């Protein structure tokens, strides 16, 4: 396995809590990629604890929103771990700045592998939290991994749908889909000729005055002191242009209605992305024999990025999330 070089100083975009301990750890997935993570434990905790793995948003790093969720849930009595997915952040994987519906789902399962063998973790009490694009990956992991007893998604993106169909399904005609595939495959040829990948750019900067409101929201998080991080793809030069190509014909939520374990999906009413959670929830409960432990929570007056860090509104319903995990990791 690759030896990672991890930053030891505290370089998160949120303050360090005095209520938890923190240390860097590594683990590997079944493709041999070594992943970097921050492990948070409640101070003075005894015995075997329920554990939660956290990842996302898509293009973010563990020093941003996922770390905030992990640290906060550790303050509330859980052993938690925020990790960088394969090919990004401090984690391994070549080429860089790629995403894969298979490998990134496996990243969540590998996190469960790691947590399951920790001496102070109860392996029967493991949950996951997926934020933004990793919300869809979390549901995909829950559909295949019976060790995951509870799943929370926050401001979820369906990365298969948005890559294939564009925002609001605005690029889903047969001709548009064909032209998208044609363009991406030409890009592959060009990159193979030059031997170098082209980055697509992170959040647009400078920000045009006529940018959609959600792009302005992304800018306010990723490009300012609120959430900027040097290793974040969204804060800097973005994903490889062809890095998300495999999502075009690999629908990650295909088997979500086979999830038996508990699921809480959280979204802001005013989020541009809210349709992802509404539709995913409807598909998840369709013909699913286990619907009593599934819940969709829509929060009024909240936009997509408010659920990254609270948006200055205390928007993240940590009390609700805590109660959900207490109920389902027991």
Question: Which sequence ranges carry the predicted segments?
Answer:
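Catalytic histidine-centered segment of alpha/beta-hydrolase-like enzymes
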Residues: 302-314
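N-terminal cap/lid segment of alpha/beta-hydrolase-fold proteins
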Residues: 3-47
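Alpha/beta-hydrolase active-site loop
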Residues: 98-119
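Short beta-strand/loop motif that positions the catalytic acidic residue
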Residues: 259, 265-267
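Conserved alpha/beta-hydrolase
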Residues: 72-92
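Short beta-strand element of the alpha/beta-hydrolase
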Residues: 48-57
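Alpha/beta-hydrolase-fold enzymes
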Residues: 139-224
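The serine-hydrolase catalytic nucleophile loop
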Residues: 59-71, 85
């Amino acid at each position: 396995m690759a030896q990672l070089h991890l930053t030891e100083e505290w370089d998160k975009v949120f303050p360090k809590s005095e209520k938890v301990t923190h240390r860097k750890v590594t683990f590997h997935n079944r493709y041999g990629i070594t992943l970097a993570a921050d492990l948070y434990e409640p101070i003075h905790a005894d015995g075997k604890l329920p554990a939660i793995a956290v990842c996302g948003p898509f293009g973010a790093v563990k020093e941003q929103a996922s770390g905030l969720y992990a640290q906060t849930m550790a303050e509330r009595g859980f052993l938690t771990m925020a990790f960088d997915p394969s090919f990004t952040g401090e984690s391994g994987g070549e080429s860089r700045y790629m995403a894969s519906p298979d490998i990134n789902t496996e990243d969540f399962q590998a996190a469960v592998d790691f947590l399951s063998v920790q001496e102070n973790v109860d392996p029967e009490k493991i949950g996951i939290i997926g934020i933004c694009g990793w919300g869809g990956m979390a549901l995909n992991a829950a559909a295949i991994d019976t060790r995951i007893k509870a799943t929370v998604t926050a401001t979820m993106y369906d990365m298969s749908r948005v890559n294939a169909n564009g925002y609001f399904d605005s690029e889903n005609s047969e001709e548009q889909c064909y032209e998208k595939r044609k363009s991406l495959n030409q890009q592959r040829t060009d990159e193979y000729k030059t031997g170098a990948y082209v980055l697509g750019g992170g959040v647009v900067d400078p920000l045009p005055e006529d940018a959609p409101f959600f792009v302005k929201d992304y800018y306010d998080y990723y490009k300012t002191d609120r959430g900027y991080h040097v290793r974040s793809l969204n804060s800097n030069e973005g994903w490889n242009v062809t890095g998300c190509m495999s999502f075009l014909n690999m629908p990650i939520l295909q088997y979500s209605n086979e999830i038996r374990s508990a699921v809480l999906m959280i979204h802001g009413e005013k989020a541009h992305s809210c349709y992802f959670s509404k539709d995913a929830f409807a598909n998840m409960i369709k013909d699913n024999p286990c619907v009593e432990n599934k819940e969709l929570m829509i929060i009024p007056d909240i936009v997509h990025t408010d659920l990254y860090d609270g948006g200055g509104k205390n928007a993240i319903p940590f009390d609700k999330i805590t109660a959900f995990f207490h109920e389902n990791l027991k």
